[in-house]
Amino acid sequence: MESTEDEFYTICLNLTAEDPSFGNCNYTTDFENGELLEKVVSRVVPIFFGFIGIVGLVGNALVVLVVAANPGMRSTTNLLIINLAVADLLFVIFCVPFTATDYVMPRWPFGDWWCKVVQYFIVVTAHASVYTLVLMSLDRFMAVVHPIASMSIRTEKNALLAIACIWVVILTTAIPVGICHGEREYSYFNRNHSSCVFLEERGYSKLGFQMSFFLSSYVIPLALISVLYMCMLTRLWKSAPGGRVSAESRRGRKKVTRMVVVVVVVFAVCWCPIQIILLVKALNKYHITYFTVTAQIVSHVLAYMNSCVNPVLYAFLSENFRVAFRKVMYCPPPYNDGFSGRPQATKTTRTGNGNSCHDIV
């Protein structure tokens, strides 16, 4: 293991690799609390990033399995939940291990091409997650504000079409991300280092890139979601009890809406710190100290935890998901009873005492 000073030196250079002068790395004064950094880098990063990776992979894979294995759960909302789980799975695969490696190793060991691929998919999956939340909020808006008129629109076919559209748009518009990132090699104090960085020296604007990422992956989608939920709340306040929608159906929609709101709020909270730090770094206002290094690691952990927390939220907030999960774990695969050939309603009613393995709420 490297000495404490070497550990700080490594992480300091990796965090400031965009600046060839390394002006923020003070080799003589930044080691006053070396024991703190040793704990942060050597223990926190592997433990937390490893935990996030395992929970994110297992949890999101279970979400996909539970919904895909139960035909009665194939509603528009659940198709969007599957897409969110897939985006989170890809984010965990392409982001978590490589960010952890960049923190603890003095060299980027994967080469220039893989650097471009990793940065590209980080941006793609981050956008895919948040714009799936936008689609989920739009789905809730239509279900609450236009429950009858939206029945012909909120179909599985249209949900799959919307999902395909956001992936095509994101995969296409994110291509410049791979172009403007790459491996940079440098030497400092007779040591060879390399990092996967934004290639500002080729004329690309780091500030422009970070501002675009901040707006497109955080501000704009959350603004759209906020408008949709404000319209929903206005409609709910003005709506009178009774009407054409049954009380049971209304309660069901409120439960699903509450779950989507919680997922969106958790996303906003988890991603806020790292978005601010990345923006501050792009403005050249970021100074390397033990506090800022620790803050950046904590912010990364918080943002990446968002990719593994959604399955936990479903388990706590959705009785349907808990029932379906138990049936996948303990029941044999269903026989072909005609479900696969018929369009499914948004919500299926449980029969009897709920012990059937074929009908999911």
UniProtKB/Swiss-Prot annotation:
<dbReference type="GO" id="GO:0005886">
    <property type="term" value="C:plasma membrane"/>
</dbReference>
<feature type="transmembrane region" description="Helical; Name=2">
    <location>
        <begin position="79"/>
        <end position="99"/>
    </location>
</feature>
<feature type="transmembrane region" description="Helical; Name=5">
    <location>
        <begin position="213"/>
        <end position="233"/>
    </location>
</feature>
<keyword id="KW-0812">Transmembrane</keyword>
<feature type="topological domain" description="Cytoplasmic">
    <location>
        <begin position="68"/>
        <end position="78"/>
    </location>
</feature>
<protein>
    <recommendedName>
        <fullName>Allatostatin-A receptor</fullName>
    </recommendedName>
</protein>
<feature type="transmembrane region" description="Helical; Name=7">
    <location>
        <begin position="297"/>
        <end position="317"/>
    </location>
</feature>
<feature type="glycosylation site" description="N-linked (GlcNAc...) asparagine">
    <location>
        <position position="26"/>
    </location>
</feature>
<dbReference type="GO" id="GO:0042923">
    <property type="term" value="F:neuropeptide binding"/>
</dbReference>
<feature type="region of interest" description="Disordered">
    <location>
        <begin position="341"/>
        <end position="361"/>
    </location>
</feature>
<dbReference type="InterPro" id="IPR000405">
    <property type="entry name" value="Galanin_rcpt"/>
</dbReference>
<keyword id="KW-1003">Cell membrane</keyword>
<keyword id="KW-0297">G-protein coupled receptor</keyword>
<feature type="topological domain" description="Extracellular">
    <location>
        <begin position="180"/>
        <end position="212"/>
    </location>
</feature>
<comment type="similarity">
    <text>Belongs to the G-protein coupled receptor 1 family.</text>
</comment>
<feature type="transmembrane region" description="Helical; Name=1">
    <location>
        <begin position="47"/>
        <end position="67"/>
    </location>
</feature>
<feature type="disulfide bond">
    <location>
        <begin position="115"/>
        <end position="196"/>
    </location>
</feature>
<feature type="compositionally biased region" description="Polar residues">
    <location>
        <begin position="343"/>
        <end position="361"/>
    </location>
</feature>
<dbReference type="GO" id="GO:0042562">
    <property type="term" value="F:hormone binding"/>
</dbReference>
<feature type="topological domain" description="Cytoplasmic">
    <location>
        <begin position="234"/>
        <end position="259"/>
    </location>
</feature>
<feature type="topological domain" description="Cytoplasmic">
    <location>
        <begin position="318"/>
        <end position="361"/>
    </location>
</feature>
<feature type="transmembrane region" description="Helical; Name=6">
    <location>
        <begin position="260"/>
        <end position="280"/>
    </location>
</feature>
<feature type="transmembrane region" description="Helical; Name=3">
    <location>
        <begin position="117"/>
        <end position="137"/>
    </location>
</feature>
<keyword id="KW-0675">Receptor</keyword>
<comment type="function">
    <text>Acts as a receptor for A-type allatostatin neuropeptide hormones.</text>
</comment>
<keyword id="KW-0325">Glycoprotein</keyword>
<feature type="topological domain" description="Extracellular">
    <location>
        <begin position="281"/>
        <end position="296"/>
    </location>
</feature>
<feature type="glycosylation site" description="N-linked (GlcNAc...) asparagine">
    <location>
        <position position="14"/>
    </location>
</feature>
<feature type="topological domain" description="Extracellular">
    <location>
        <begin position="100"/>
        <end position="116"/>
    </location>
</feature>
<keyword id="KW-0472">Membrane</keyword>
<dbReference type="GO" id="GO:0004930">
    <property type="term" value="F:G protein-coupled receptor activity"/>
</dbReference>
<keyword id="KW-1015">Disulfide bond</keyword>
<dbReference type="Pfam" id="PF00001">
    <property type="entry name" value="7tm_1"/>
</dbReference>
<dbReference type="InterPro" id="IPR000276">
    <property type="entry name" value="GPCR_Rhodpsn"/>
</dbReference>
<feature type="transmembrane region" description="Helical; Name=4">
    <location>
        <begin position="159"/>
        <end position="179"/>
    </location>
</feature>
<feature type="topological domain" description="Cytoplasmic">
    <location>
        <begin position="138"/>
        <end position="158"/>
    </location>
</feature>
<feature type="topological domain" description="Extracellular">
    <location>
        <begin position="1"/>
        <end position="46"/>
    </location>
</feature>
<feature type="glycosylation site" description="N-linked (GlcNAc...) asparagine">
    <location>
        <position position="192"/>
    </location>
</feature>
<keyword id="KW-0807">Transducer</keyword>
<dbReference type="InterPro" id="IPR017452">
    <property type="entry name" value="GPCR_Rhodpsn_7TM"/>
</dbReference>
<keyword id="KW-1133">Transmembrane helix</keyword>
